[in-house]
Amino acid sequence: VVGNTKTNDNVIYRELRIKPGELYSKDKVVRTIREVGQLGFFDAEQISPDFKNVDPNQGTVDIELGLVESGASQIELQGGYGGGGFIGTVGLAFNNFSTKNIKNRKAWRPLPMGDGQTFAIRLQTSTFYSTRSFSFVEPWFGGRQPVQFSLSLSSTKQYRYDYFTRRADKSQSFEIAGFNVGLAKRLRVPDDYFVLSQSISYQYYNLQNYFTGLFTFGNGESHNIAYNIALSRNNTFTNPIFPVGGSNFTLSARLSPPYSLIRGDDYADIAERPEYQDNSGNPIQAEIDQARYRWLEFYKIKFDGSWYTRLFGKFVLKAQTDFGFLGTYNSNLGNIPFERFYLGGDGMQQYAMDGRETIALRGYENGSLSSRDGSIIYNKFSLELRYPISLKPTASVFALSFLEAGNGFDDFKDYSPFDIKRSAGIGVRVFMPAFGLLGIDFGYGFD
């Protein structure tokens, strides 16, 4: 292996499918190129095996794998002025980090790199809102097996903002804090493209005099503990930014404990209990919902599948389908107001205080294909025709045209997979190592 000026040899060697002393296999050479390209540390278009000292009589050959390092770190600096005053963002993501060399002064050029770890921090603040997040990923936990360890921490606090006085009222606040810790293991059966991921996550929601209509209660707290499991298979090749073949799918489940079953309380008569009624005997909905949602009880099933096919020349067709369902173990509790799906728009508005998932469907306004309270079930289909303009390590650029269709529903009994809203449009994507993936789309919704 030559050309790896930053990445350590062992990070590359553990991805190789060709081993010294084995019989030559074209399939293993192709797989090696694919796996090294998927690391994201090298220019996938310039990974070139060089065959040397070919000896047909002895049945031996030397293979030299030529690599070109590409930037793996990203910097995010943003500043702006909006209706809520100044908003500043600082983010750093190091995608080829080395924790073992932190104490080695010589390794700080400018940072200790080369072990394939991911380390990211992000801070955002404004007059009434602040958030902090940290994440770390070790792709080979322990260094011997392809078991990925991940850890993330986050904290968000928002105050009620008065747009007339331009002041934040710190007596009215909403706070979220949480963590996620997980392991992901590369499987051998059915094949070694499969990965099984498992994690435990926890979010703490705390409302203090925060009556905004987002929830039916403005004082109280909620706890969201969930076990997350996902089975995925990714055999796309060769460039992770612009795949030209293969598929990538993920089937996942997010499960909370069945608290009502554990406690032996199904909440069927909660509105009739005196502690949840006013002096006139009328139920107090805010206190009822605070009791129902103190410990969030739900399950969530999702599927995401993408297929890439080279059509002719450099044109590549991407076909994708998405599905999500939020359910409840106890019908008396109903579906939680958190974790819901909001379909429509660019899908970029990830900031949300209620743990919602924004699902892009270009050609429509953000969230316009879901109700105000969010959908509990959705499906989406899309086709993209892509053409690469440049796939250089400094910047990868490709143009695309798309057809999309999807819809969100408030109840499973209303779900109809072909009752969908359609759109079409064009766009362009630009990937620069220092800034990540940038893009712009122009879409039109037909329905």
Regions found by a protein language model. Give the residues of each.
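C-terminal soluble interaction/assembly domains
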Residues: 18-23, 418
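C-terminal outer-membrane beta-barrel translocator/porin domains of Gram-negative envelope proteins
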Residues: 56-57, 73-82, 213-389, 401-402, ...
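C-terminal beta-signal and terminal closure region of outer-membrane beta-barrel proteins
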Residues: 345-348, 353, 413-447
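Extracytoplasmic/secreted envelope proteins and their assembly/folding machinery
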Residues: 9, 13, 26-33, 302
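Long hydrophobic segments that form regular secondary structure
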Residues: 40-46, 254-256, 389-391
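Gram-negative/organellar outer-membrane beta-barrel architecture
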Residues: 22-242, 247-248, 362, 374, ...
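N-terminal periplasmic "start-of-domain" segments of outer-membrane beta-barrel proteins
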Residues: 6-20
